Amino acid sequence: VADLYVFSFKKDNDEFITAQKYTELSGSTISFSTLSGEQRIFAIGNVDYDMFPGLSERLESWLGNNHPSKSDLTSLLAEVGGDKAVQFANTTSLVSGLWNNEDDTKDYCTVKVDGTLVEKGKIYLKRVAAKVTFKIEVADGREFKLKSYQVCEVPKKVNVWEGSTSEEIVSYSTQELTISKDEGFFTFYMPENIANGKEGCNSADDREKLSKGSLRNSPPEGRVFTYVDKPATYV
C-alpha cells in the first residue's frame, strides 16, 4: 500500500469524527488519532494510481474543512481516466476497506479513553480494480495463434466500497488490441463492478448466447446477451 486515507464516523449518528492521510507506510500497522466511543473506520489506499485520476483531489478536499458525510464516502465513485485503462501495467491497485472485528460479526469498534480498543480487529483492504489474465490452452494436435483481442463494456466508474449501490454505470469498449508475440496469454486491468445475471443458465455456451447481434460481425453496441445485463465486461 503506497498511500492510505482513513476516515472515522460516530456509530450512532454517522457524524464525521476525523480523517488522516498516510504516505510513508511500512508493515501492516498505522497509528490513528481519534476520539473515544463507538465508531466506524473506513480506509482507501493506493489512491495516486493512474487508472483513477481525480480521486486523490476529492479525498484531499475532505481532509480539510470540507468534511464528508458517511453517505458521501459510501457512495463514492472512482472514474476511469481515458479509454486505455485496460492496458495500465501498474502493479498497485486501488483498495478500500472497513474496520471489522476478528470474527467479522461487527463493523464498528469501541475506542476506550486510553486509546485502546475494546474489540480486536483489523481494516481488511480489498482491491477495487482487477488484473485479469486470459491463458489460451488447446488440445493435443490442435493449434491456435493469438493475434488480437478486444475488451468490451469496461466500466467507466467503479464503486469504491464493496456492496454499495450507485447510479447506472457507463461503459466503453476498447479498440482491437494486437499482440506482438504469441505467448498464449494476455493481461488487462479493469474496475470491479459486480452484478447478478438476468437468470441462471444451464451450460457454458449459454453465457455467450446473444438475443441480438453476433460476436464476430456486430459492434459491441449492437449486441444483446440473453442471460447477462449490460454493462457486463467480456473479451
Can you say where each PLM-predicted feature lies in the sequence?
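Structured interaction patches on ligand/partner-binding surfaces of diverse proteins
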Residues: 20-25, 50-119
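Internal metal/ion-chelating core segments
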Residues: 119-121, 134
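Short, solvent-exposed beta-strand/turn "edge" segments of beta-rich domains on protein surfaces
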Residues: 121-127
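Tryptophan-paired
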Residues: 1-64, 131-235
